[in-house]
Amino acid sequence: QLLRVYIDGIPLDLASQLLPGRTKLGLAGLAVHIHLHAKAQQQYSDKQVSQAQAVNLSKAGFRNMLDSLEKTIQPLKWEPQGTEWGNYYNITNYSDDALKTKGEIVGRFVEKAAPRTAWDLGANNGMFSRELSRRCVETTASDIDPAAVEQDYLAVKANNEQHLLPLVIDLTNPSPALGWAHHERESMLERGPVDLVMALALIHHLAISNNVPLTSVAQFFAFAGKWAIVEFVPKSDSQVKRLLATRKDIFNKYTEEGFEEAFSAYFTIEEKVSIPGSERTLYLFKRK
């Protein structure tokens, strides 16, 4: 969210305020590159400096500074705590066999659609995104949870994966066009459309948690991609029951029939498969 506001980078003084106090200790690393630099910037912000007083850093000096920055950044690690979906696949109601079968069905759908580009929305740690990327589909895997995206990113980095880009995106409040005249950074939708949109275990969160009508979800998917792989999770599923436990069930159209009706306005149902060992159904849609 900070990078939406500061598209050229987070200001030094703000970064200095946000970092833990322990990073101010020592004479190297973050203490120098962030805190001392921010202090010096603030000290000289209202002072005039002549050209003669300006310090010209040599090429070697720039290289040394970059080396120091790299050595400061490389050891930094983030251990996320208390995030919503970072541990999702350890607590989901899918059995190992059901997860495996689900992956096989998704893979078959991908091969049938034969996309070159794809968005996996609500991708979590990218488990099923790899059914796309391993088939050389240029895939953006997005999720609202930074911990899940971090897991995905670390796996991409460790395995040198070339076709998968993990991003933190809140689909109910996606990245808008930013910058001068809204042209410096394109919005999420302006970066599409793609050949295929995938939304697994996501529809119930959009429709129930965020009150987005199924017709609006279908319209968005049709705008974003030619094909769609969508998982429908019924009200009888434990995850939907959990969502409805704290709110009144006003979602009369959230049924399998209502879901198919909403999506049929924009797509044809190419294939529909129930996932064994679960109450969920996978759909392959093609835009009309």
Indicate residue ranges for each PLM-predicted region.
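Conserved beta-strand signature within the Rossmann-like core of class I S-adenosyl-L-methionine
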Residues: F220-K235
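N-terminal auxiliary segments of SAM/dcSAM-dependent transferases
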Residues: Q1-K77
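Conserved SAM-binding motif I beta-strand of class I
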Residues: E138-D143
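Conserved SAM-binding loop of SAM-dependent methyltransferases across substrates and taxa
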Residues: N125-V137
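S-adenosyl-L-methionine
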Residues: Y153-R191
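Conserved class I S-adenosyl-L-methionine
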Residues: A114-N124
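A short, conserved alpha-helix within the catalytic core of class I
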Residues: H205-F221
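A conserved beta-strand element that flanks and buttresses the S-adenosyl-L-methionine
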Residues: M198
